Amino acid sequence: MLEQTRALESSATIKLVTSGRKSRLPHLVEVRFVASHGGIYVIGAGPRSDWVLNALATDRVKVRVGELAIPCRAQRATLQEVESTYGLFKKKYGNGIVSRWYGGSTLCLYLEFAGRAERRGAVVGESETKSDFDAWKASGRGYYDDVAAAFDSASEEYDFTISRNFVNTWIRRRSLEILARYMKKDDVALEIGCGTGAETLQIAKSVRRVVATDISDRMVSLLTAKLRARRTANVMPLKLGAAAIAQAAPYLYGGRASLVYSLNGALNCEPELDAFASGLERILSPGGYFVCSVRNTICLSEAVLHALLLQFGKSLPRLKQPTMVSVGGMDIPSTYYRPSDFASHFKRSFELKKIIALPAILPPAYLSGHYVRLTAVHKPLEVLERAVAGLPPFNRLGDQTLFVFRRFG
């Protein structure tokens, strides 16, 4: 309880996790709060806010703060509690913020602690790790077990985290735009590392069928729930690691895919890349496209930004591979690739058609906070990004590298 109190005292906001009233999917918002009377008080911006309605409908909610997840019961605060909460909010955040964001709102929720807080790693930026690969390797931990556990842990906050990051959303949009050039309406597509299915649901609108695979049980479960809520019938979620991808054959029409894709670095977490390439050879039809993006060992915009900030050592972790990355509050191993090294794993059966940086000029996602403050340069930089991302040498100097391969035959 002492740790819980300290975590709340040191935090300006909490993440409140509710369940959708119809979909039952996790719904996460970041809100201001005050801790008082053995619980937490939050003020709603309006009575029709989804998170407010969710909390009142389902009663049970979860509060994430620091490394803790705290189960709570939600109920409307009394008028007397509302008045008291406004006073505490003004003391904590100032009259200006309270007036601007909550002026006139009488909706206040009391979140009563309803069980023991669960400890989990704090969700931080991908590069904010506390361990190194040599120490992880010496621990004897199972590679796939750790990767699956990390993405299980990240699943509930995954969509929220991506949507709050400008560069991440730009990369997702750009990746789908490029992938669309290689899709046909009658394609049977196979996805490696589907996550919660944000890309899956978009792609399913444009192809005959998608078999969406991921190593994480919870990621697959979330996608399954989304499909049910949206009544999407042409997607098959499947728990499967990349190296075992040939096992997806029974779920594909004729045992083959005409398009395979893997976005946002899922293959950086697959240590058996040659085994994956062999499985891909068996499952992708001759003439079919394989489109993927992986983290790069050299990132031009990262190096420039760190140099401007006099942080000359911050780019070094990319140079030593494998490395550790933070996912869902856990450190897991990952391997970044020089574009030529990654492409060499597929040269036996695939023609390399394109290499595109994602992004070349914009910063990597974990430095998005610096970029969003420079609103005056957004448009010209994004125009420049599109102009140079596919041209040498810039196409090999991005945070991620997007590859387009075509199966021989």
Where do the language-model regions lie?
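Short, structured beta-strand-loop surface elements
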Residues: 46-117
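Conserved class I S-adenosyl-L-methionine
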Residues: 121-184, 198, 202, 290-319
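Class I SAM-dependent methyltransferase SAM/SAH-binding core
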Residues: 196-245
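A short SAM/SAH-binding and catalytic strip from SAM-dependent methyltransferases
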Residues: 259-272
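A short glycine-rich, Lys/Arg-flanked "PGG" loop and its adjoining helix->strand segment in the class I
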Residues: 274-286
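Acceptor-substrate binding/catalytic loop of class I
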Residues: 325-341
